[in-house]
Each structure stands twice: as structure tokens, then as C-alpha cells.
């Protein structure tokens, strides 16, 4: 597994199951991250390492089904509800997007490891691109590179996002961007998830801000 060299395919399946179990518990108000994220992740995988691969797959299927049923029962207010997650409190809608993001990227990892094709359909790619773009302000803030007051325009295919230079900022729609990043949606999504290196975007404007985005972009942490 190139993206997670210490894990087998079965380990990735166990990781995805643990993530869905935690997401379900969080929406029920019964989960909070204790300690470091890496330690929690490693412990979740290690807890299932003695199980046959088939049992881990069945566990993931059950966890994913329970999580989907929970989401299917939500009304509009439920989707807006705030829950605990690995980097703080987020909306249930955002948590759903994060779980899809995690499952898609690890699914692609497993497909590559087993020599199979894995592609994103248009609706999924749109959601993944939206999540990846919207992580820019929080990534800048959490990693000490915030640029309060800056305006960033991201163009990914037919979609575009006007973003602030720090978490919580919402630029005026009429504001002139300090930085414009333009990229192929899939290339941007893979870069944000740490599956590729290099910067797959064209840059217009503030080069130092572009470097800060490149150093802090992450849709998976």
C-alpha cells in the first residue's frame, strides 16, 4: 500500500470501519478524540490485526451501513448539527463529506495495490473537490500560516471558490483575489489528500501565499 506502507489492504479496511464507527458514535454524542490522532488510528488498526480479512470486510460493511442509516434518518436540522471530530467540532454534513473523502482515497489506494481500476464519477469528484478547496483556510490557520484578510480564488474545472486566508473568514463576493489557483479537479483532490507531490495548479498573484497553501493543504487531517 504505497500511501500507507505499514498497512496491508486488510488493515485499511479495518481503518475505514473504525472511522465509520467513530462517526456514528460522534453523531450520537458518544465520541471524542482522546490523545493523538496517529495513536488513535494505529490502535484502531492494531485491534483487528488478528482477524481474518473476511471478518474485517464484514465489519466495515456493517459499520458503513449503520453510518449510512444514521445519515438517512436526519432532517435538515440534523445535518447542520455540530459534532466532535478529529480536528475539532464540525457539522454532520462536513463529517459525512470527510468520511466519503477517506473512503474514496483509501478505495483508490486499495485498487492500485491490487491492480484494479478506480475512478470518481462526476458527483463524487465534485464533492471531493469542494471539500479539498474548502480546507485551505483551516489548513493555513492550524499550521501557523494564516493570512487574515487575504482572498484566495480557487478554480477547479467548472467550479470556483472564494476563500479567506484564515479559518472562519468569508470574503466579500466582490473582493479582488490576492491569489488565484487553477487546477484540474482530480489532480487537486489527489494533491490535497497527499497522494501526489508537486503543485498541480497554475498561480496568479501572491507567490508567498501560494507557497503557504502548498505547505498546508490537506483534506485528510
Positions of PLM-derived features:
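Short amphipathic alpha-helical segments enriched in hydrophobics
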Residues: 16, 20-27, 71, 196, ...
Amino acid at each position: 500500500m504505497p500511501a500507507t506502507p505499514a498497512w496491508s489492504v486488510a488493515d485499511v479496511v479495518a481503518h475505514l470501519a473504525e472511522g465509520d464507527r467513530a462517526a456514528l458514535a460522534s453523531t450520537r454524542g458518544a465520541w471524542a478524540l482522546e490523545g493523538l490522532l496517529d495513536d488513535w488510528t494505529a490502535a484502531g488498526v492494531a485491534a483487528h490485526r488478528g482477524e481474518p480479512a473476511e471478518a474485517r470486510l464484514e465489519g466495515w460493511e456493517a459499520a458503513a451501513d449503520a453510518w449510512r442509516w444514521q445519515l438517512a434518518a436526519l432532517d435538515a436540522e440534523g445535518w447542520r448539527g455540530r459534532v466532535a471530530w478529529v480536528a475539532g467540532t464540525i457539522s454532520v454534513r462536513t463529517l459525512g463529506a470527510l468520511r466519503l473523502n477517506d473512503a474514496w482515497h483509501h478505495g483508490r489506494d486499495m485498487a492500485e495495490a491490487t491492480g484494479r481500476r478506480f475512478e470518481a464519477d462526476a458527483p463524487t469528484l465534485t464533492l471531493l473537490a469542494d471539500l479539498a478547496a474548502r480546507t485551505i483556510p483551516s489548513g493555513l490557520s492550524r499550521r501557523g500560516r494564516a493570512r487574515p484578510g487575504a482572498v484566495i480564488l480557487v478554480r477547479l474545472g467548472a467550479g470556483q471558490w472564494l476563500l479567506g486566508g484564515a479559518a472562519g473568514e468569508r470574503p466579500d463576493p466582490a473582493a479582488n483575489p490576492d491569489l488565484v489557483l487553477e487546477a484540474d479537479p482530480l489532480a487537486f483532490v489527489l494533491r490535497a489528500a497527499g497522494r501526489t507531490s508537486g503543485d498541480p495548479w497554475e498561480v496568479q498573484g501572491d507567490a508567498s501565499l501560494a507557497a503557504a497553501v502548498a505547505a498546508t493543504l490537506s483534506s485528510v487531517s
